[in-house]
Regions:
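PRPP-associated nucleotide enzymes
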Residues: 1-129
Length: 129
């Protein structure tokens, strides 16, 4: 089987997660009222890695959730699927970092913001890609 092109190896990925994490911590001046929410599916794994790195650096566990935006997309037909969203915390008055693995047209980001605001009004919404 032919190997696919490797865009980022394990060390580069760890370095990128560390940089994103430091940026989040600096921008928010720590972990107060901070939570991360990954967009299904690949954003969830990245959000979990960021939350783990925050714990490693700050010794503070922050809420981490998963957001299914399927029902909020305006460019796709509604699917007969169940909502895989798993946010076991209140986003009201929180600094919510939406995490995804790519940014192209902004449709996923808009859908994520719509889905998030339906769950409560965050203090701020930030994007980590």
């Amino acid at each position: 089987m032919k190997r696919k092109t490797v865009i980022m190896d394990e060390n580069n990925m760890k370095r990128a997660v560390a940089r994103i994490t430091y940026e989040i911590l600096e921008r928010n001046k720590g972990t107060d009222d901070l939570c991360v929410v990954g967009i299904f599916s690949r954003g969830v794994a990245l959000a979990q890695r960021i939350a783990s790195k925050i714990y490693e650096l700050e010794h503070e566990k922050i809420p981490c959730g998963a957001l299914d935006i399927t029902a909020y997309r305006d460019d796709r037909k509604p699917a007969d699927t169940f909502d895989r969203t798993k946010i076991d915390f209140d986003v009201k008055n929180k600094n919510v970092v939406i995490v995804d693995d790519v940014f192209y047209t902004g449709r996923s980001t808009r859908a994520a913001i719509d889905a998030l605001i339906e769950r409560g009004r965050p203090k701020s919404i930030q994007l980590a890609v």
